[in-house]
Design a protein with these regions (language model features):
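Positively charged n-region of N-terminal signal peptides that target proteins for export
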Residues: 1-9
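C-terminal motif of bacterial Sec signal peptides marking the signal peptidase cleavage site
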Residues: 15-19
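Bacterial signal peptide processing site
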Residues: 21-23
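Low-complexity, Pro/Thr/Ser/Glu-rich flexible segments characteristic
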Residues: 26-38
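A bilobed periplasmic-binding-protein/Venus flytrap-type ligand-binding module shared by bacterial periplasmic
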Residues: 48-52, 134-155, 160
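Ligand-binding "clamshell"
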Residues: 114-131, 135, 144, 201-205
Length: 207
């Protein structure tokens, strides 16, 4: 079924549905540093993607095939289910993340800048030199959920996504959302100079 008018979808996925990816643990990036010593438990993980101009069928396929829960479970994160939603815009998704109604969001990097006090940047899409900062995608977590705001969950998420990017099945699923996905760990401070230039340019355009 294709619902072209649907801009927000919410679905609870079981672990068996989300856990469709297999990886070689010895080859997965960041395994040693990305596994919390104490299990992290979440009854439901709320994940949101920005719909934008993306094809609805691709987004539905992404929801069904992305093995994020399985990748996190390999890093000692126990998740009962995952609720996947698609935001109407980058700003709407960033606000949902800041409010705490979303735990993890895939969204443009620049959408994170206005919410530095309430969200934490986890990963940024790797890009060639010269790529405009507004063209880079990011993955961020809310600070409102005390479980996902921990260093342990953040490390596990970074390791899980980097492993998915290196895995053929995981990369294929992510490519439904972003062409040639390749995320790397990042912090907001990594983009201080680029952010300042972007905000100065944006302010000048408004004035």
């Amino acid at each position: 079924m294709k619902k072209g008018l649907a801009v927000l979808l919410a679905l609870v996925l079981t672990l068996s549905l989300a856990g469709c990816g297999k990886k070689n643990d010895t080859d997965a990036p960041g395994d040693d540093d990305a596994i919390p010593e104490t299990p992290i438990k979440l009854e439901t993980l709320h994940v949101e993607f920005v719909k934008g101009e993306r094809d609805v069928d691709d987004l539905l396929a992404l929801k069904d095939t992305l093995p994020l829960v399985a990748a996190l479970s390999e890093r000692n994160v126990e998740i009962g289910s995952a609720a996947v939603t698609f935001g109407t815009s980058a700003e709407a998704t960033a606000q949902a993340l800041a409010d705490g109604s979303v735990d993890v969001a895939f969204l443009p990097l620049t959408a994170c800048f206005d919410h530095e006090d309430t969200i934490t940047l986890a990963l940024v899409q790797d890009a060639d030199d010269g790529t405009a900062i507004e063209d880079r995608e990011a993955i961020a977590v809310t600070k409102k959920n005390k479980t996902v705001a921990t260093d342990g969950f953040l490390a596990a998420l970074r390791g899980a996504v980097e492993a998915l990017c290196a895995d053929e099945e995981g990369s294929a699923a992510l490519s439904l959302y972003e062409a040639a996905p390749d995320y790397r760990s990042a912090e907001m401070s990594d983009f201080a100079s680029e952010r300042a230039a972007y905000e100065k340019e944006s302010s000048g355009a408004i004035n």
